[in-house]
Amino acid sequence: MDSQRNLLVIALLFVSFMIWQAWEQDKNPQPQTQQTTQTTTTAAGSAADQGVPASGQGKMITVKTDVLDLTINTRGGDVEQALLPAYPKELGSNEPFQLLETTPQFIYQAQSGLTGRDGPDNPANGPRPLYNVEKEAFVLADGQNELQVPMTYTDAAGNTFTKTFVFKRGDYAVNVNYSVQNAGEKPLEVSTFGQLKQSVNLPPHRDTGSSNFALHTFRGAAYSTPDEKYEKYKFDTIADNENLNVSSKGGWVAMLQQYFATAWIPRNDGTNNFYTANLGNGIVAIGYKAQPVLVQPGQTGAMTSTLWVGPEIQDKMAAVAPHLDLTVDYGWLWFISQPLFKLLKWIHSFVGNWGFSIIIITFIVRGIMYPLTKAQYTSMAKMRMLQPKIQAMRERLGDDKQRQSQEMMALYKAEKVNPLGGCFPLIIQMPIFLALYYMLMGSIELRHAPFALWIHDLSAQDPYYILPILMGVTMFFIQKMSPTTVTDPMQQKIMTFMPVIFTVFFLWFPSGLVLYYIVSNLVTIIQQQLIYRSLEKRGLHSREKKKS
């Protein structure tokens, strides 16, 4: 029995350590804050390019759909601001969440265009193109399902380049179509590129982190190829000039933060070069450059790419590009978190409340694990029955640890007791607990998701710490109801304070996770009583007062 309790303590400490370690691995170390200056520099060739120099400001046009509110600069056609009207900046706020931003304090842009030998975005061909637009404000009207925003540029040779943003109702994926009309007598060689650039340091208005470890998630770059489905690239790695330079057919590049992402997905059959670059001034970039395309004289060439700018909605992202849904970063336990989330989402489709969905999924998980739980308690009961024999054996053999171990194993074999039989439910519960943590911290559906009463956001900590206290109370009751053979005063004190210690740990955990643990403890109490009644009938348990 002592070993079972020690294993429980070790298991809980292990869970806490793994969460802390995951945070340490994923969080980006923040260097000393430095002032970020505005720039329109782009590394639109490869990781080694020095970038397109700044060339003056264009006009700012606005595009509004039912889910996006973008600002596009006619100089280059870059998306310099993106607001998400469906997602408030903070709980209870009327201000929309801002994903892309261009201010003196912070840069986060989605850049794109045509480079290559004859591309207007090639630095060797002069300033970036200044596109013409028919109006400065575009709005997706009621009843309209698609909105096109065409931008045109004609170079000195009379070649016309058209860049058209295509928006669809309810969609965070924006197609960017290019048309190149060759008015000259020689072929034009152009390549599409897409680049995401961002300031490494977060200003106060962008920093949604916290001083506690339970609320930090990965912020950085990522890419995908047919060979590497999902690879993260930290901002500080790019800032240290440890740059990516990969050629691939298909795939995507992205920048990630908790719940939201931007990504460029090239749409071509050729090879793309994926790169990262340190652009200076505290700004880093990840992007792609497509294989060159030749447009013959008198002909028109067409190319396209897709920009994702919005929340990390798994099913929608998966429909846009293979493995794009993996940007919902569930950590190393993704293979558990993903099925859990699918089950949770299915339950939510019936009950309509994420908190009640968590309660139901807890009952389902614990119900599936009931045979193992019963085996655990049976093993623990048999171990208690053997304690007098084990104690007598220890007294008889004294300090001969080797003989103690040999005779103890022989005793277990004779009595058909597995000393580790009570560990399996604990081993199974640990990854489930961690997977649920990742799921709560990574699923946009649970952001600002209310439960009941004072719990208005299941992804955030309980503002009044009521749930952690209730968790500690349930843990205390489980401890008091469980038989023990602990006689060492120090171990007794440690076990007595375990509910208090873990209540403190859980103060900063997401309330949805604490809710899961409370319900799991309540299920444990119920199952405990049912199992004890069964064990009483077999003579393996008695209702005598628990030792303290």
From Swiss-Prot:
Single GO biological process annotation from the record: protein transport
Domain of life of the native organism: Bacteria
Transmembrane segments annotated in the record for this chain: 6-26, 350-370, 424-444, 458-478, 499-519
Subcellular location field: Cell inner membrane
InterPro entries documented for this protein: Membr_insert_YidC, Membr_insert_YidC_N, YidC/ALB3/OXA1/COX18, YidC/Oxa/ALB_C, YidC_ALB_C, YidC_periplasmic_sf
Keyword Protein transport (UniProt): yes
This protein's GO CC annotations: plasma membrane
Region annotation Disordered: where it falls in the sequence: 28-56
Topology in membrane: Multi-pass membrane protein
Biased composition range(s): Low complexity: 29-42
Gene Ontology molecular function: any one: membrane insertase activity
Primary localization: membrane
Keywords: Cell inner membrane, Cell membrane, Chaperone, Membrane, Protein transport, Transmembrane, Transmembrane helix, Transport
Short name of one Pfam family: 60KD_IMP
CDD domains in the record: 5TM_YidC_Alb3 (cd20070), EcYidC-like_peri (cd19961)
The family this protein is said to belong to: Belongs to the OXA1/ALB3/YidC family. Type 1 subfamily.
Assembly with partners or alone: Interacts with the Sec translocase complex via SecD. Specifically interacts with transmembrane segments of nascent integral membrane proteins during membrane integration.
Role summary: Required for the insertion and/or proper folding and/or complex formation of integral membrane proteins into the membrane. Involved in integration of membrane proteins that insert both dependently and independently of the Sec translocase complex, as well as at least some lipoproteins. Aids folding of multispanning membrane proteins.
Name listed for the protein in its UniProt record: Membrane protein insertase YidC
